[in-house]
């Protein structure tokens, strides 16, 4: 996903809930592999979709354009619903460090166990940075490439075994790919990975949600 000059407008009135079969999801996944991204890949894809602005002077760090605030959303704080209202500058270097961390986490499972802490004096844009990252992730979720799917179990035929529940939705947004036979999902991911960059590739090791594992 690359939208260097775009502004994403979030309109909750246009949101829709849809249910599709696993086969339909697989068709969408092959069209938009980003539907299968893990949390790190989703955030990294969202923050980089607007691209970067190369510095005019070689000793200055590049600037990620999501810092310009390219999201129009009714959920933004303090009434700043329009784009370009939370323009951040002067923090390009720490943001580059965060982006390098996310890139590493996309390709290295061990790096996902790390965490970063924003340390700085009052009014140094720590909260605004996290808010911008959150708004940008919200905007990514409104795109076809950023839709987020989870799994719903139909328990009608065995509801007596689940205290009368007729359906259960995964609380952890389980990746539907984890419900494919392991040999099939490895074959599918290998095929998809051939067309992706290294930060977008999928790990063929699937770890299922414990809650959903009990319902399989």
Which residues does each PLM region occupy?
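Conserved ASCE/P-loop NTPase catalytic core
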Residues: 20-216
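N-terminal accessory nucleic-acid engagement/regulatory domains that precede
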Residues: 1-24
